[in-house]
Every structure is written in structure tokens, then in C-alpha cells.
Amino acid sequence: MRDCGRRCVYCAAALEFDYATLDHVHPLSRGGAHVPGNVVLACGRCNRLKGDLLPTEFFARFPSAGMNFIMYARTVHRALKRCARRAVSLAYARAA
């Protein structure tokens, strides 16, 4: 939750742990996968609004959600890179 700034990926509302929901960016019902790169934290309201819409459909209806998502994706991308660097460093250290 820290990696997303504790905010909803779509509306940027502050998220409390008890009210955060997981959203599949590309819905499972439409061929999306249950993998880390396809799962984000969202508030319940945004998750319900998005439903099984594809990101392009949702962002066409709610452009501000698209802008927030772009900001969030950048944050997550950096966080994932940091995690990957740590994992690689640890793997090399164990192999040595």
C-alpha cells in the first residue's frame, strides 16, 4: 500500500487499509490475468464505477481517473524497479 502513496489509483483519494479494494486493470471477465502488473489498489467507489470496463473505456468516461492512473503507474513502475534491483542484488549475493 505504501508503493501507491496510500491513494486510490483512479481518484487519488486517501486509502485506509480497511477500505482499499483490489482492482484488475484489465478485468478478469475480459481476459485479464491475476498478476501483480494487472492489480491495483482502488477505493470501493471507483472499483464499482469501473466494474468490468477496460481501462480505455473507463478513462474515456472519467478522464481524470486516467490522469491519476498515469501518475500512479509511474510510481508503481519505480517501486517495482527498486524491488527488482533488490531481488537481483540479493540473488547475486547468495550465489557468491
Where are these regions (language model features)?
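Short, cysteine/histidine-rich loop/knuckle motifs that typically chelate Zn2+
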Residues: V9-C11, R45
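Histidine-centered nuclease catalytic patch
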Residues: A12-L41, T56, A60
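A detector for short metal-coordination/catalytic motifs
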Residues: G37-N38, R45-A96
